[in-house]
Structure formats: structure tokens, C-alpha cells
Curated annotation (Swiss-Prot):
GO terms for biological process, alphabetical: diaminopimelate biosynthetic process; L-arginine biosynthetic process; lysine biosynthetic process via diaminopimelate
Signal peptide: none
EC number(s) given by UniProt: 3.5.1.18
Similarity remark: Belongs to the peptidase M20A family. DapE subfamily.
Keywords: Amino-acid biosynthesis, Cobalt, Diaminopimelate biosynthesis, Hydrolase, Lysine biosynthesis, Metal-binding, Zinc
UniProt-recorded name of the protein: Succinyl-diaminopimelate desuccinylase
SUPFAM superfamilies named among the record's database cross-references: Bacterial exopeptidase dimerisation domain, Zn-dependent exopeptidases
UniProt cofactor(s): Zn(2+); Co(2+)
Function: Catalyzes the hydrolysis of N-succinyl-L,L-diaminopimelic acid (SDAP), forming succinate and LL-2,6-diaminopimelate (DAP), an intermediate involved in the bacterial biosynthesis of lysine and meso-diaminopimelic acid, an essential component of bacterial cell walls.
Active site residues of this protein: 66, 125
Protein species of origin: Nautilia profundicola (strain ATCC BAA-1463 / DSM 18972 / AmH)
Amino acid sequence: MNVIDLFKKLLSFKSVTPDDDGGMEFIKEYLKGFEVIESEKEGVKNLFIYKKFGEGDHLCFGGHIDVVPPGEGWNTDPFTPTEKEGFIYARGAQDMKSGLAAFLWAMKNAKNFKGTLSALITSDEEGDAVWGTKYMLEILKDKNLIPDYAIVAEPTCEKVFGDAIKIGRRGSINGVLKKIGLQGHAAYPEKSINPIHKVAQVLHKIAGVDLDDGDEFFAPSKFVVTDIRAGMEVTNVTPGELKMMFNVRNNTHTDKEKIKNFIHEHFKDMNYTLELKQSAEPFVTNPDTKVVKALDRAIKNHTNITPQHSTAGGTSDARFFAKHGVKVVEFGVKNDTIHAPNERTTPEEVNKLADIFKEVIEEWN
């Protein structure tokens, strides 16, 4: 089975998160001869496949078999991979069954690796991500099987295949600020405290503001207001409370305490409450580490492109590897149609991705 046949087989599983639709059993059979550790909790399946070839490094490939629901607007059946006009169309074509097929094929066909080679695959990356990679890594920790290095095969490339490696990710902090006012009649504003008017006075000072200067790896952390609600949808009552929701995609220079102080600085003269939740921690892998250099070389060899080292974009399961001290990076196909109708990629990208992963494995030692 070549990598394109494997890719199409994986695309045919209707693995809408957290259902794997039998895909995990197929993968176990495909890599028969590898050791297997499995977990299943709250409908989420995780699969860790590994083989020890020698006493060298433990290199792990990470990925997910689950996909988002296909939605409307497709010109083909989203779970029947369709090849036309130089593309393969199906849900998960870019995110991320291309990456999954590429590293599974590479693991099966690569030679001369002298350490431990593994793959951690979950059916819960697109969902809540509570019982997926995060949970499985705790199991591996108890078994002393945490890898030294990891490559998560998420789609990372922007304009052309090979142009970007993710060497880190920003974190994500969500906030809810409630401004307490005093409800009253719109005809007597002097008898009420209108939280809309109060917040409006400072909103232009905080919306879109950079909270730090960033650094060589990260853009500045930015304060982004995402929702403001107040009132009862009537014109003659001023509201008694306003709720403002916001998000900060934070780098390593901004944390919850810094955001708390930023809010207090601007709202200290007002009656308010604040809730902050860190849903993802930021991380960065040094570009001089072995895994980054290995990917750089292989990408250059197969595309003649020197990839950019990026930390842009949202969160991914790579953050869970980083929390265990794993030197982790991400690399995969282009990401221009992820989660969209008519998601697609090219056979050329999938073939090159598989060859790159194979070279990384074979040239590792």
C-alpha cells in the first residue's frame, strides 16, 4: 500500500470527533509488529504504537484521526475521497489525515533507526481535548515512555508546501469582566449607573492593545474583545450590569497575573468582577534542537525551501507534549482549506511529506 492509498483509506473513515469509526483498529493492523498501548474514556480512543530498535532517542509522531463535522456546501461526498483536477477532496484531507498517513507510512518503511520510534494518535483533538493526547501522555509518563522528541503532523504550511514549521504556539487566556451598575429609567440617567457608558470610556484604550513587545519567536500578546452584552433589548431602561468577554493569545511574556493587573489599571475606579481561565499554555522549542534541524534539512532536500520557524496560529496538541518536557515541533501540508467545505490537498504534498518524515527517521542517528 503506497502512501496515497493509505491516505484515501484513512479519509474514508467517518471519524467525526470523538468517533474513530474503526480507524484505530486499521492503524494497529497496518503497523502490525509494533507494541500497542490503548486507552478509551468518555468515548475517546487513544492509540500509542511503538517499537524499540536500539538504545537511542525516542522519537514520536503525534496526530489525530478525528475531524470536524463536514457541514454544508460540499461538491463531493466528504467521506468518499475524490481525486480531480490535481487535488484529493475529503474532510480531513489537510487536517490532518494527510499528516497521519505520511508518518504511518514513514514509520512502516523507514530503515536504520536506532532508538524508539512511536506514534500517539487520538480521536479527540477537534473536540474538548480532555481525554485525548493530554490524558494519554499521563499514562505514558507512568510507564516511563514519554518521548524525547515529537513531530506533530498538523498542517503548518501557508503559501507553498515546506514554507513553515511550528516551533511553538501561543497560549490562550479567556476572560469575562462584569461591570456592575445600577439599573434605572432612561429618562433619569442621573439616578442610575449605566455600565455601558462607564465601559465605553475605557474600551478604546484596551481593545486591540499589545500587552508586551513579543520577541524573536512570538508576536506581542494582544487584548481582543470578543463579546459585550448588556440591557434587556428595550429603549427605556438602562442596564444594571454589563458583561465583556475577551481573549488573549499570550506568549511567554504575558500571564494571567499580568492581564489581571492590566484590567485593574483601567477599571480600578469601577465596581467589577473578573474571571480568567488559561485554556492553553504557550511554549517554544529552540530552533537549534535536533528535531528542528532534522526537519529543516529534510524539507530543504525535498522542496528546496528553507522553512520559516513560526509560532503563529491557534493551539494544538503539541502543547501537551511540551508540558512533559518533550522537544516538539509541528509540520504538515498547507492549511488553506482546513475546516472548510471542499477541504483538499494534493497527492504531491502527501508524497513529499511522507518522504520528509522517512528521511528524518533514517537520518536521525
